[in-house]
């Protein structure tokens, strides 16, 4: 059953998240990624949202492999207020920000990802430092900050669009997974056929 959360719960969760970030920075003195989801409305955790979050973590791991990075620390937290993941990395903060923005901008699902990169001194790395545009609105594609501050779109519209994005991403992933399993099955059957001794009549 999906649980709704209050503003007080969200504020408490934000405070705990900041405290966790500060503890990691104090312990490692290295940049970190704080990954959460941009989910509008009172429901912040559901099987569909968790699927989207898991995909985001998978994409981050792929980027780590490409960059030959192994996180010094990786923490994952699941609360009624939403999923959170923290990655401490021994790398240049701007380099990290570049691949997180690549993930955020690559697909519709990425627009629901909030991958903050935090320097050892606690300052966030801004997109502007990489000469990148700000985040775009889910619905109209305009500047997200403008639409949010002016409340251009209703909560219902944002929730509907969010569900659409999460559902499409889940379905696409299921199709891709099924295709990979089919290829593996065919390969397995072909190997069995090749390994079978030839019978002569």
Residue ranges and their predicted role:
Residues 41, 63-74, 82-84:
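Non-transmembrane, aqueous-exposed alpha-helical and coiled segments at domain scale
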Residues 75-126:
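A broadly conserved sequence feature marking short terminus-proximal activation segments
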Residues 18-20, 70-72, 98:
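Hydrophobic alpha-helical segments with strong N-terminal bias
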Residues 70-71, 172-176:
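Flexible, glycine/charged-enriched surface loops at secondary-structure junctions
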Residues 25-36, 70-78, 195:
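Short, compositionally biased low-complexity segments
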Residues 192-201:
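Single conserved hydrophobic/aromatic residue that forms the stacking wall/gate
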Residues 1-61, 104-174, 182-188:
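Long, contiguous binding/interaction regions
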């Amino acid at each position: 059953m999906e649980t709704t959360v209050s503003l007080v719960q969200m504020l408490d969760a934000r405070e705990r998240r900041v405290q966790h970030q500060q503890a990691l920075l104090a312990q490692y003195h290295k940049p970190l990624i704080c990954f959460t989801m941009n989910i509008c409305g009172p429901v912040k955790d559901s099987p569909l949202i968790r699927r989207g979050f898991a995909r985001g973590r998978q994409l981050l791991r792929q980027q780590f492999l490409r960059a030959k990075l192994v996180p010094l620390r990786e923490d994952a937290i699941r609360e009624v207020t939403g999923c959170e993941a923290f990655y401490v990395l021994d790398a240049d903060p701007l380099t990290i920000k570049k691949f997180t923005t690549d993930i955020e901008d690559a697909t519709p699902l990425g627009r629901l990802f909030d991958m903050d990169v935090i320097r050892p001194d606690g300052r966030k790395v801004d997109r502007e430092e990489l000469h990148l545009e700000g985040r775009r609105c889910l619905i109209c594609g305009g500047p997200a900050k403008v639409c949010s501050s002016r409340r251009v779109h209703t909560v219902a519209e944002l929730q509907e669009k969010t569900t659409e994005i999460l559902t499409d991403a889940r379905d696409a992933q299921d199709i891709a997974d099924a295709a990979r399993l089919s290829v593996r099955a065919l390969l397995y059957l072909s190997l069995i056929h090749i390994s079978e001794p030839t019978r002569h009549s």
